[in-house]
Amino acid sequence: MGYNVFYFDLEDEMNSAKKLRRFIKPGETVLVTFNFEGLEKEAGVYREGIGYVWDEYAVPCYNIAVDHPYYYHERLADLPEKYYHISIDRLHEAYFKHFYPEFMHRGFLPLAGSRLEELCKLNTGKEEGKQSVEYPAERIRKPVEKKYNVIMTGNFTPTSFCEPYIHWINDEYAAFYQGIIDDIIAHPHRTVEEVALEHCEREMGENTYKDLRMALHRMIFIDIYVRNYWRREAVKVLVDAGIQVDVFGKGWDELTCGHPENMILHP
């Protein structure tokens, strides 16, 4: 599109910061980042008592948040004045708008790899004098030879990792947390926040959105537990049925299954 792009090297913050200041043009430059990189008070862009370089030069900050907002509760404190949040999931978008109304939300951006045919209307004609963009349909894509039949991408954490967090307060809270976990696993079509909020309301009555967003942040171990429970079960049922699965990610060597020879580990 013709824009100059500056890549900030987080492994060389101080040198990058010097170059960044020379690159910034107030009123023109914007920050585009993922998962709050450059917005966590890094040494090169933040100085105690002064603040962010983004505020110093009035740079708009567009943050593309990949994970669920309840993972970011603490990061959503003390951000630059011109902070704009972008979600990659429709449910994340709805959650953020409801529980963090004090922030400017800039909508939804699909991840790379999403089928644009499902997100955009095909239009090969002219509209208001401009040629619209045509996205290739599935049927006209050239077939490619597959190297792997079944792939699992993502890290694996045994559910035992979450046990200390389930029991971190007392037995009453542990039963509360375990009840949420069991409910989500029994009803996989429901989201973590949907079930957790239902249990919170049942146990504690109505609460403010600020209280609830803090409570959900403190229950992110439930998300980790359920996510890895289903990852474990999905891979186990396949490899134990004799299907070879190529897994890409950390922690899969800790998976216990009947036929580990069918699970091919990749770094």
Can you name each region flagged by the protein language model?
Residues 1, 102-267:
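Nucleotide-sugar donor-binding catalytic core of glycosyltransferases
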Residues 1-99, 117-120, 134-139, 264-267:
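Extended catalytic core of nucleotide-activated donor transferases of GT-like folds
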